[in-house]
Amino acid sequence: MNVFGTDGIRGEVDLRPCGTRQAIDALVDERRLTLPLAWLAGQALARTLDAEDAGVVIGWDDRPGNPALVHAVQDAFLAAGWNVTLLGTCATPLVHHVLLETKANAGVMITASHNPVEDSGLKVFDASGRKSTPEFEVRLTRTMLDLAQEDHDLLHLVGDRADGDHGEDRFEDAHADWLHARMEDLSGMFPD
């Protein structure tokens, strides 16, 4: 079993409370993305990578359910002792850029790209900024299934906020500077 599709985990956002076992079933059987499922994904990523002094970069787009999903993913990483950098509402390339700039261990972009607005999803990136491999996603799924068998008190996830330092201003400027520098590198390829 693999809860990941071709580009991460995606489903219709469902903010109603449910247990972790029900969260897995809701995604697999009904394509519903719940807060406990987002938490399981964050915990699974933290446990699978198991890095010392680990850090994760989290960005999201402006879909209605995303602040609550961000809170769930953030909570999972904080519970695992990870440093969390919240980028705020941003484009996926900013997650890649900040991931590489900060030398974080992982990145998560909360979006469903071209899917309907009521959907969202989790795209996972490794320390090199690459999309997770199918083999790694199977490992994450197994860890999520194991975690779902444990009892977790996740009622505190109900809500729609993302706490913490949102570094979007600091990182958007750095990303813009990086893009300008790249364009200057390519300027010789184009005639005036």
Q: Predicted regions span which residues?
A:
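An N-terminal, well-structured beta->alpha segment
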Residues: 1-73, 79-80, 168-192
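Bulky hydrophobic/aromatic "packing anchor" residues in well-ordered structure
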Residues: 7-9, 95, 140
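Gly/Ser/Thr-enriched, mixed-charge loops and adjacent short helices
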Residues: 12, 120-192
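Ferredoxin-reductase
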Residues: 46, 50-132
